[in-house]
Amino acid sequence: MSQLTHINAAGEAHMVDVSAKAETVREARAEAFVTMRSETLAMIIDGSHHKGDVFATARIAGIQAAKRTWELIPLCHPLLLSKVEVQLQAEPEHNRVRIESLCRLTGKTGVEMEALTAASVAALTIYDMCKAVQKDMVIGPVRLLAKSGGKSGDFKVDAHD
């Protein structure tokens, strides 16, 4: 089992020193879901929400969140992201919105937290914009789908998960 990288020998939290690591292309994808009543989802799909375009706002929020992950999550490195993408898809058959984020850079540390933050904040933005209509929406699950690049190797969620 791997050791926790953000805990030093004395058991104290610390920021990992990545200065000796090689720069590689790193990429991560994450997903989140927001489940709601069919009427709420229909309002988002047909664009009749009084606050405007819910998907456009959530997309921008997710992109902005990825860029600011280092300010939100202690011990994360500030990263020079080369790409952030947030896709939102209505899934009427499940009364939910699926959010998928992609983050990429060439650097010394991974972008998993940025991808997870992008998907999470996009989901929170959907909730915020729709809470006047429905307060019992459910956010989740939120998970890492894949990562590539770096010393720890590649990871991909099993297609059956």
Swiss-Prot record:
Keywords, comma-separated and alphabetical: Lyase, Molybdenum cofactor biosynthesis
GO biological process: Mo-molybdopterin cofactor biosynthetic process
Coiled coil (UniProt feature): none
Binding site for substrate: L75, C76, H77, M113, E114
Function of the molecule: Catalyzes the conversion of (8S)-3',8-cyclo-7,8-dihydroguanosine 5'-triphosphate to cyclic pyranopterin monophosphate (cPMP).
Assembly, per entry: Homohexamer; trimer of dimers.
Family: Belongs to the MoaC family.
Protein name: Cyclic pyranopterin monophosphate synthase
Annotated organism of origin: Citrobacter koseri (strain ATCC BAA-895 / CDC 4225-83 / SGSC4696)
